[in-house]
Structure formats: structure tokens, C-alpha cells
Amino acid sequence: MASDRADAPAQDRSGAISRAGMGIASRSSGGLCSRGRSSAKFLAMRNPTDATAAGDDPLRGTRVVSLAINVPGPVAAARLAALGAEVTKVEPPAGDFLAGAAPVWYEELALGQRVMTIDLKSVAGRAELDALLEQADILIVSSRPSALARLGLERATVCARHPRLCTVSIVGHPSPDSDVPGHDLTYQAEAGLVSPQALPVTLFSDVAAGIDAAAAALALLVGRSRSGVGGWREVALVDAARALAAPRDHGLTRPGGVLGGGSPGYALYPASDGVVAIAALEAHFLARLVGGLGIAHSDASLIAAKIRERRVDEWVTFGREHDIPIAAVAST
């Protein structure tokens, strides 16, 4: 979370990058900095520009300080910013790994936020952070508890110094294993989301945990509005991964499952120039598909033969015209 430099002054690199956004989720926590854990529900959000145009900023005036670098914390902060929160992103002198690894995404996630460099290993840096927290409503951290303790940011200290602060701690595993190291790959592996033949196609655990963390922050704000005190909620990346694995674990997406190849109306089919995804899961969609294709019944081989006759864009248009969920499979 911080570099080895002990004398780096705080630097404001903001210029406020304007606002970014996303969605939501959570599980309960109680009174004065009691510990909670988040589960994985999701609330889709509109484009942040749409929300701004409509004057719909429910978190206007809410101040967020995020010490979380890499992916989960920035995803959470971006979602809160999309709801109107004022976000200050605090980075160590070494910066955020994501800025070098995926600079465009880094900028998108930091959109509209004030970005500062503070060396939290220094006395001056900790004082600078303390001043920010005096005015903040939400704090997002993603270091392991042992690292937070070395910076004087363990739960007991933060709650005692800032009793109204709503703190979300993103960890790999829930307590008492929250000091166990890991990354998105290891959490997905634990949840059974990794194929032995290939790395994951995206950072499912990181992004899902960021969504959960945003929801956890909102839950804490609601709790504070009732009790007058903040709290501390723990969001575990492995929990987020396991939540994403639930459809597979319950058989929906396993081979032969309803969403795993067992339904001819819910499948991928090669067209003449690419591949289309057809999601005619419900009976009315499937009836429209069969009728529109002019085939006798919903046999996968009959559907496949018809789909091969036209281009992808023609099938997308066909789906719109017949009110059937059909999309092109985008290349990566």
C-alpha cells in the first residue's frame, strides 16, 4: 500500500478526471465498527452521464477516501462516484499497478476523482490521511490486516478515531484468514472457476468484489443514518468468486444443464461469417425462433443448418424483427 520512502510529501495529482461508474451488493454489520461480511447481489446502474443529466446524484455530498489500488477498490470507488460521491484516491509514491498495466482502464475507473500521492509510512503522510478521514464518510482499504496495522489503520484504531466513518475492507479471505495472500487467479481457482488448460478470461473475483464493496459502503451509510455511528465491513474476494460459481455449482451451466448446452434455443451457432449467441430460453422466444426459421421443431441440428445460411448481422436483425434474444459473439 505504501512505498519504502519515509519522507515523501503529500502530492495532489487530481485535476479531477470527471465521473465514472458501475453497480452494487452486501451482507449486514451492526453498531460501532462491528464487523460484517458482504455477499454477492448485483444492482445494475445506468450510464453515469445519464444519471448526471437527470440530476440523479443520491451520494452528492458524500466524501469517499480510497486507499485501495489495483482493481477491486477502484471498481468500488468508481461506482460510488457514479452515484455522485466525491472520491479522493490516495496512492503510495510507487503509484497504482493498474496505471501501468492497463492505463486506459485506470483512467476510466478514476474518472472524476481527486488523485493524491501520500506516503503512509511517514508521520506527515499519516497526519495528512487523518485530516482527510476527519471529513470523510467512507473509507475503502484493500491491504491485508497486518499491513493496515503497521500503518495505524487497524479496525480498532480507525473506529476509535473516526466513529462516524464507514470503512470497507477488501480482503482475500474472510476472517480469521484475511491475512492469507492471494490474487484474482487464486480466488477463482478456489471457487472452481479456472480451467486447468487456461488462465481466466477476465478478473471475475476482482470486479465482483469491487461491486460488493460498493454495496457494503452503501449499507454502512444506511446503518449510520439510523444509529449515528459508522462501521467496518469486510468484503472477501473468494466469497465473490464463489458467488459467481453458484450457477455452475447448482447445475445450471454444467454440460447438459439448462444453460450449459441442454437447451437448443440457448446456445452458440456458427453463421456464414462468424458466431451468434441465441438465448431463446423461454417457450415464447423458442416458438418465435422455430417459426421465424421455418423449421418443424426446436432441434439443434435444424437450427444450426439454418443459422449457417446467413451472416451474423442478418441474424442480429432477424432477432430484433422477431423479438428474439440474438447477439453477435464479439471477437476479443
Locate the predicted segments by residue.
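Rossmann-fold NAD(P)-binding glycine/threonine-rich loop
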Residues: 153-162, 166-190
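Conserved beta-strand positions in the Rossmann-like core of class I SAM-dependent methyltransferases
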Residues: 88
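Substrate-binding/gating loop at the entrance of the active-site cleft, primarily
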Residues: 67-82, 94-102
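Structural scaffold positions in well-ordered secondary structure
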Residues: 80, 113, 140, 158, ...
